[in-house]
Design a protein with these regions (language model features):
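Surface-exposed cleft-lining segments at the edges of enzyme active sites
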Residues: 81-83
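Outer-membrane beta-barrel transmembrane strands
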Residues: 87-103, 112-114, 128, 206-246
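Surface-exposed loop/interface segments of Gram-negative outer-membrane beta-barrel transport/assembly proteins
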Residues: 6-78, 118-123, 129-221, 239-248
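Flexible glycine-/small-residue-rich
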Residues: 2, 16-18, 100
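A beta-strand signature from Gram-negative outer-membrane beta-barrel systems
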Residues: 1-13, 86, 91-93, 106, ...
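Acidic/polar, low-complexity linker and loop regions
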Residues: 105-107, 202
Length: 248
């Protein structure tokens, strides 16, 4: 709760806060004992009832470093693929406000920056808000007005939904634990032509999705108002009001 003071003069306020997100409260429970594939056989795709893991068996698998298919052990090295893909999520809020109050009026200005780092790579939001307002009263004339500017921009908001671009489904539901997602951070074999991934028919490398299949936004919003009033008599006054709304 903020209360207006009665004292005249200059007032400067600085606030800063940082919050960290704990991640998902609940996630689907999935098995990590069998590889991708079906009917007891390893293969890439959207099924996860392939060969048994961690019992000494091998299968022809994709090597993300040599970009070749080689015979490798079937082990559950990707049990924590979703967790290992996620990043520390945080929200930082910084605000500076300055106000001046005098005998006939007051003026206030404020600048706020909010930075939200998402839990997936390349997910972040920047929001800047600047506002200025003032009021004045002198004899029979009074005036007040304000202007607020909002700017919001982010590089990508993909990855949270259902489908081929959904990280939760790609890493937890539709793929097995026989690969480590961290081995695929270098998601290009040939820049802008061929991605580094074991199966591009069903879905893409999650790091490729995060950095290349992007849906960004950058917008500016301006709101303003102006009000003036003149009292001719206790029962007669003239009022003028105007507003501004701009979006780009």
């Amino acid at each position: 709760t903020t209360k207006k003071g009665k004292e005249e003069g200059l007032n400067v306020t600085v606030n800063s806060s940082t919050m960290f997100a704990a991640g998902y409260l609940r996630k689907p429970e999935v098995q990590t004992s069998y590889s991708s594939g079906s009917q007891g056989t390893y293969s890439t795709g959207g099924y996860v009832w392939g060969d048994k893991l961690d019992i000494g068996r091998t299968a022809l698998q994709y090597d993300p470093y040599t970009h070749e298919w080689v015979d490798m052990p079937l082990v559950s090295k990707g049990k924590n693929n979703l967790k290992n893909f996620q990043e520390l999520s945080m929200v930082t809020n910084n605000n500076v406000s300055v106000s001046q109050k005098g005998k006939y009026g007051s003026v206030r200005t404020s600048l706020t920056h909010v930075y939200n780092k998402g839990q997936y790579p390349n997910q972040k939001l920047n929001k800047i808000t600047y506002s200025v307002s003032g009021d004045m009263k002198w004899k029979k004339f009074s005036f007040d007005g304000g202007l607020t500017y909002n700017k919001r921009f982010y590089p990508n908001d993909m990855g949270a939904g259902y489908g081929a671009s959904g990280f939760l489904y790609n890493l937890l539901v539709w793929s097995g634990a026989e690969y480590d997602i961290r081995d695929y951070k270098n998601y290009w074999i040939k820049q802008d032509e061929q991605q580094n991934w074991m199966d591009t028919k069903w879905y893409d490398n999650p790091y490729f999705i995060a950095n290349e299949i992007v849906r960004s936004s950058d917008y500016d919003l301006i709101n303003g108002y102006l009000s003036a009033n003149y009292d001719f008599t206790p029962w007669l006054n003239l009022s003028l009001r105007s507003g501004l709304d701009s979006y780009s």
